[in-house]
Amino acid sequence: VVKGVLLTVFLCSAAQASEMEEIIVQARAVDESVRDIPVSVTAFSEEYIEKYSLKNLEDVAMHDSSLEITRQNSGSGAAVGLRGIKSSSSTLGIAPSVSIIIDGAYYPSARVVNEGLFDANQVAVLKGPQSLYFGKNATAGVITVKTNDPGDELEVIAKAGYEAEFQTTTLTGIISTPISDNWGIRLALQSRESDRGVLSNDAPDS
C-alpha cells in the first residue's frame, strides 16, 4: 500500500490563432513569466499532470528528456540528475546535484520522488546552476513542486480508480476550507494498493 500527500506549480499556455498565452511559474517563490526567467525552465500545469496521469516525479522525467531519475536496487533511494549531472543515490556524505523543493521547503532525500502529484498545482524543472536562489545543492538544477492552496469556499473531492494490468485500486480524498479571512486548511490523501507487480521475498525462520 502506498500512501502520499502532495505537491507542484504551473500555468500552461495554449495556442490560439498564432498567439500564445503568457506562461507564469512560481519556481523562484514569486510569480514570474517564463520569458523573464534567465534560465531554462520546463513547467507542468495541473491540467497537464491530470491529462497525462503523472503520478510522481519519475513520470515527470518521462516527459522531460533532460531529467533523469535512477533508483537504487533496494528501491529505497534514487539519484536525480539534470543534463547528465547527478550525485550518487547511496552516498549520504555527498550533497545532491539537484534540489527538490516542495511548497518552498527543501527535501534533502531523493526518496521524495515517491510522493504523489495528485494535488499538485504545478511542477517546474529549472536546468543549470541555481545556487543563487536555492543554495549549494543545486549545481545541476532544481525541481519545484507547488500544491494547491486552500480556496475561499469549502471544497470536497473524492475519486476512485482501478488499473487492470497490475490490479491497482486508487482512492483519493481532498477537503479544503477557509477558517478565517486570511487562513485556510487543505488536506489531501491518497491510497494505492496493487495485487500484482509486487514481489514478496519471505525468508524462512532460521
What is the meaning of each model-derived region?
Residues 41, 49, 60-61, 123-128, ...:
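Non-catalytic regulatory/gating segments with a bias toward low-complexity or hydrophobic composition
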Residues 17-50:
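Short, acidic, small-residue-rich periplasmic hinge/interaction motif at the N-terminus
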Residues 19-21, 37-40, 63-65, 76-78, ...:
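Envelope-exposed proteins and targeting segments
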Residues 26, 58, 62-103:
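Extracytoplasmic beta-strand/coil segments of soluble accessory domains associated
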Residues 27, 102-104, 147, 177:
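Residue-level signature of outer-membrane beta-barrel architecture
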Residues 90-91, 97-98, 103-129:
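Short acidic/polar hinge/loop motifs at secondary-structure boundaries
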Residues 1-19:
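Cleavable N-terminal targeting peptides that direct proteins into the secretory/outer-membrane pathway or into
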Residues 97, 109, 118-121, 131-206:
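Outer-membrane beta-barrel translocator/receptor signature
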